[in-house]
Protein backbone atom coordinates (compact mmCIF):
# COMPACT_ATOMS: atom_id res chain seq x y z
CA UNK A 1 0.00 0.00 0.00
CA UNK A 2 1.43 3.37 -1.01
CA UNK A 3 0.81 6.52 0.96
CA UNK A 4 1.16 10.12 -0.17
CA UNK A 5 1.47 13.32 1.83
CA UNK A 6 -0.82 16.15 0.72
CA UNK A 7 -0.06 19.86 0.57
CA UNK A 8 -1.84 20.31 3.92
CA UNK A 9 0.39 17.63 5.49
CA UNK A 10 -2.30 14.94 5.57
CA UNK A 11 -1.26 11.38 4.70
CA UNK A 12 -3.60 9.43 2.46
CA UNK A 13 -3.73 6.03 0.82
CA UNK A 14 -2.99 6.27 -2.91
CA UNK A 15 -5.61 3.59 -3.62
CA UNK A 16 -8.37 6.18 -3.11
CA UNK A 17 -7.06 8.54 -5.83
CA UNK A 18 -9.43 8.42 -8.80
CA UNK A 19 -7.95 11.20 -10.98
CA UNK A 20 -5.19 13.80 -10.89
CA UNK A 21 -5.74 17.27 -12.28
CA UNK A 22 -3.62 20.37 -12.98
CA UNK A 23 -5.31 23.52 -11.67
CA UNK A 24 -4.70 27.15 -10.80
CA UNK A 25 -4.85 28.26 -7.16
CA UNK A 26 -5.30 31.64 -5.52
CA UNK A 27 -2.92 31.32 -2.58
CA UNK A 28 -4.62 34.13 -0.66
CA UNK A 29 -8.13 32.69 -0.71
CA UNK A 30 -7.33 29.05 -1.43
CA UNK A 31 -9.80 28.97 -4.32
CA UNK A 32 -9.09 26.47 -7.08
CA UNK A 33 -10.01 26.79 -10.75
CA UNK A 34 -9.33 24.79 -13.90
CA UNK A 35 -9.02 28.04 -15.86
CA UNK A 36 -7.69 31.48 -14.98
CA UNK A 37 -10.40 34.13 -15.03
CA UNK A 38 -10.56 37.85 -14.25
CA UNK A 39 -11.02 37.09 -10.55
CA UNK A 40 -7.46 35.81 -10.17
CA UNK A 41 -4.79 38.29 -9.08
CA UNK A 42 -1.52 37.42 -10.90
CA UNK A 43 0.46 38.14 -7.73
CA UNK A 44 -1.48 35.45 -5.86
CA UNK A 45 -1.65 32.87 -8.65
CA UNK A 46 0.08 29.53 -8.10
CA UNK A 47 -0.04 26.26 -10.00
CA UNK A 48 -1.39 23.22 -8.18
CA UNK A 49 -1.96 19.51 -8.61
CA UNK A 50 -5.15 18.13 -7.08
CA UNK A 51 -6.52 14.63 -6.71
CA UNK A 52 -10.13 13.55 -6.77
CA UNK A 53 -10.72 10.60 -4.50
CA UNK A 54 -13.10 7.70 -4.94
CA UNK A 55 -15.14 9.37 -2.18
CA UNK A 56 -15.66 12.52 -4.31
CA UNK A 57 -13.27 14.77 -2.36
CA UNK A 58 -10.80 17.14 -4.05
CA UNK A 59 -7.46 17.33 -2.26
CA UNK A 60 -4.52 19.62 -3.05
CA UNK A 61 -1.42 17.46 -3.43
CA UNK A 62 1.11 20.19 -4.18
CA UNK A 63 1.51 23.85 -5.19
CA UNK A 64 4.23 25.13 -7.52
CA UNK A 65 5.55 28.52 -8.59
CA UNK A 66 5.58 27.71 -12.31
CA UNK A 67 3.35 25.86 -14.70
CA UNK A 68 6.29 23.76 -15.93
CA UNK A 69 7.08 22.51 -12.40
CA UNK A 70 3.43 21.62 -11.86
CA UNK A 71 3.08 19.74 -15.14
CA UNK A 72 6.30 17.80 -14.54
CA UNK A 73 5.17 16.87 -11.03
CA UNK A 74 1.81 15.68 -12.36
CA UNK A 75 3.56 13.56 -14.98
CA UNK A 76 5.85 11.98 -12.38
CA UNK A 77 2.97 11.37 -9.97
CA UNK A 78 0.78 9.75 -12.62
CA UNK A 79 3.64 7.45 -13.64
CA UNK A 80 4.33 6.58 -10.00
CA UNK A 81 0.68 5.68 -9.41
CA UNK A 82 0.38 3.63 -12.63
CA UNK A 83 3.62 1.77 -11.86
CA UNK A 84 2.31 0.94 -8.39
CA UNK A 85 -0.95 -0.49 -9.75
CA UNK A 86 0.91 -2.53 -12.35
CA UNK A 87 3.24 -4.01 -9.75
CA UNK A 88 0.36 -5.90 -8.13
CA UNK A 89 -0.14 -8.14 -11.18
Where are these regions (language model features)?
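Eukaryotic intrinsically disordered, low-complexity regulatory linkers and tails enriched in Ser/Thr/Pro
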Residues: 1-89
